[in-house]
Amino acid sequence: MANEFRVCDDCQATNLKTLLPRLKEIDPDAKVEIGCQSYCGPGRKKSFAFVNNRPLSAPDEDELIEKVKKKLKK
């Protein structure tokens, strides 16, 4: 089963220009869905992504990427 990343294109703490290439680097075959994830509260303050339907957030993008890598290794 392919991995899935879901990210918001409207949240203030998420920069799609830098986040999407980094997610694709982790798994080039993953399905990526861009749009509102109804995660607005945390999305104002933290970088986040849904990985295989599970929300992951971190104070910055670097920490988020580390969490994504760790999640996919399980």
UniProtKB/Swiss-Prot annotation:
Top-rank taxon, per record: Bacteria
Cited InterPro entries: DUF1450, UPF0741
Family: Belongs to the UPF0741 family.
Name assigned to this protein: UPF0741 protein BLi03984/BL03913
